[in-house]
Amino acid sequence: MRPKLKLYLDTSVISALFDERNPERKSLTESFFAEISKFDIYVSTFTLAEIEKTPDPVFKKKMIGKVSKIQVLNIKSDIEEIADEIILSGAINQSYLEDAFHIATAIMNEMDYLLSWNFRHIVRKKTKDIIRMITTINNLRQIEIVTPAELL
């Protein structure tokens, strides 16, 4: 039997479950979560910190409830180094350091996929190409960056 794929979820995937502003994305995310037992799912302490910053207490409580059932990755010492490289290479703007940390966490914990709905910074060709270059140069495991819908 093949091992389950290891998936890292950024905060946008968790928040999409409860975001009524985009019904299609919400529905696709719900469909993905209905299949979640097929995968090993992870978030990180960065995800938890972003959820804690959520100003809406009801929305925040729902997200905390959802991540409470997901394995949390601890931060490894080399994540900051890779996050810096992601920013210096232009994959992610310095203003969005959290996004670089999500990617670096997924890479350094050898995830198969990073799932995100963040098309502005993460799920885009430029970021994917630069991340592929960084992982190749540093002899790190390649990671696929996709939306939850792409794994349905």
Task: Mark where each language-model region is.
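Catalytic and substrate-binding regions of cell-wall glycan-acting enzymes that process beta-1,4-linked
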Residues: 136
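Short, C-terminally biased terminal segments at protein or domain edges
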Residues: 139-152
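A residue-level structural signature of the nucleotidyltransferase/glycosyltransferase Rossmann-like core
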Residues: 6, 40, 114, 143-144
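General small-molecule cofactor/ligand-binding pocket signal
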Residues: 42, 73, 144-146
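Active-site neighborhoods of divalent-metal-dependent phosphate/nucleic-acid chemistry enzymes
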Residues: 72-128, 152
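Residues at the C-termini of beta-strands that transition into short coil/loop
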Residues: 45, 76, 149
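Short, well-structured N-terminal submotif of metal-dependent ribonuclease cores
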Residues: 1-43, 50-64, 70, 88-94, ...
